[in-house]
Amino acid sequence: MYHDFESHTITRRSFLKGAGAVGAAGLLAACGGSSSSTAASASSASSGAAASGKGLSELFTYETSGREIESWNMLYSQQAIDFNVTTNIIDGLISFDNYGKPVPALAKSWEHNEDSTVWTFHLRDDVDWVDMNGEVQDHLTSKDFLVGFEWVLNAKKNQAANTSMPSTTVVGAADYYDKTYGMDDAAGEALTYEDMLAAGVGIDAPDDYTIVYTCINPCPYFDTVASYVCCYPAPPALVEKLGVEGFRGVDYTQQWCCGPYLIEEFVADNSKRFIPNPHYYAADECNRFERVSLSMITDLTVGYQLYQNRELDELELSESTLTTITSDTSNAYNDQLCEKRPTKYAYDFHFNFYCLNSDGTPNENWNKAVANRAFRRCFQEGLNLIPYYARFNKINPLKCENNYYTMKGVCYNSKGTDYVDLVAKELGIDGEKYDGETMVHLRKSTADSIAALKKQAMDELTAIGVTFPVKAPFFFVAGDTVAQDNATVLKQCFTDSFGDDFIQLELGTYVSSLAKEVRIPKLHGFVINGWGADFGDPVNFVGQEILHDSNAYYAVNYSNIQLVAEDPADYQKELVDEFEQFTDLVNAANAIVDDTDARYEAFAKAEAYMINNSLAVPCYYDVRWCLTHVNEYTKINAMFGPCNFKYVNWETSEDAYTTAQYEEFAKAFDAAKS
């Protein structure tokens, strides 16, 4: 059910009237952390300009249609649309500050041995599980982490979700998963954490407030693994109460919480309301809102109306709204336009190599075309996406250009070199810099070279019966005018780059769930999807595209290359061979465990191979302009983990921030970061 936003019968102030208030605590840099160094970091991000007016006690924010939460189980979900909600009700061992540095959460401290093979986490002793009514249900101890870890590794309970990280890092984890995978459902579901320990999995709880993980090999980045949901706790009593199917599909009314907020109200596809957890362990160590009200909106145009009525406190701007504001010098919002930081996600074209028609028959024309390397290289070498980038950042569109599969800032070698700079060197673009005018991958392309590549693809494909133009099924959520306009502009980019005789986007819509309505039925020709790191190592990105791994998220769920590899047609054998070579390169890089620099160099070669063969094609970074009463530079900003949408320690202002203030915020943030 959608709220009729046009009527505005429920105003911001009338909604607030009579609402219960829960006092907010003092400001520190990160909930759960109280060190003076992190507190200083938090304040430094905003010291460049004073906030105008007092801060907000209640926050009104939004999510767009088609991005409704699908799972309330953090151990089971692998989607940002879920974590953006559940991170506010359940905490993990580690959180992050506004610079992306690890800070304490459920673990008050941690350390590792000399070679980083044994990691010990010391838990707080003041954490309780509460239900959605705020009533204490149980006390959190190390046993909860044993139960949670067994759940993740048990194929009959968690169905392979989130197993790739522990399986490749923790002793015995992969073997335990394989053991449970081979069992019948009843036998697997009956196993407990004690069976996991008996099987030799490298996790131990020497006392009620200590958890120890033993790694297969030296793992200097394991703290970033431990920050992810694969290492989150599960309350034993709740798991026992709900049973396996019940806990896997737990809803918000059943869930127990140990995070900063509770869900006061949830109306699917309409709204959510968060209120402070009255028993939150870090209540005196961070600041929270008295209430967070999140509305599902059909598109950003509706969001702009809500922002103008002060029914939203922050809003990313669509291209059309940004144009409306900037084209009118008298517009009141002209001096309030704020450019945001890039999100943690690197967006890519993810091809579907096993596309089906709506009747379940193979889409042979697309499948043949996309298996052809020259066809895919046209996406890489000939597609001018600047008009598409302008849909996200009209003022500085090329700030959105992405040339890598892995997100910037995920990891650095011993010399402080960003991993993606190593990839750039392998690709031969390390000398290319942002110029605000030309896409990097088009600088070496000419009209003749693009035409030659197009001709090569058409000749090779015509020879195996492909008809032109090739129709590429591409879907967006119905009713979202911004998404529709984005898709329309993307379609025009293909026309402008290649003409209409080669590739044409065949636009389609889904009602509410891309997964259920498009991805699972395999209807997409390609999707543009973003991946954010779960932990700080390149394998977490490129490992999602490999063969022979049931945990490779994109290979299993989007490209369907693993299905193709089982019985490839003649026209798919070269494609499968390319994926096999890529998989070998990734596995070889992942086997280097005693030399981080060599490991990253090997991964860079693997990633460059993937990009050069266009097995997936880098597309964009999300760099938006916004109107806001929230200082983005005080939000959690980690390149990995699920914590970035946690509503804690946000600096806000009753008056909207200005462009000048945000420029000062950025300068202060960068100065403090360096």
Which positions does each model-derived feature cover?
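N-terminal secretory signal peptides
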Residues: 1-10, 18-30
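Ligand/substrate-recognition segments at binding pockets and active sites
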Residues: 268, 396-397, 433-533, 578, ...
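Alpha-helical secondary-structure segments
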Residues: 141-147, 208-214, 260, 289-291, ...
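Aromatic- and charge-enriched surface segment that lines or borders ligand/interaction sites
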Residues: 108-172, 212, 303-306, 365-371, ...
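Gly/Pro-rich hinge or "lid" segments in bacterial periplasmic/extracellular proteins
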Residues: 185-190, 197-200, 206-209, 214-293, ...
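N-terminal lobe/hinge region of extracytoplasmic solute-binding protein
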Residues: 61-114, 256-257
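Ligand-site clamp/hinge motif
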Residues: 244-252, 279-328
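Detector for C-terminal structural segments
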Residues: 21, 28, 378-424, 478, ...
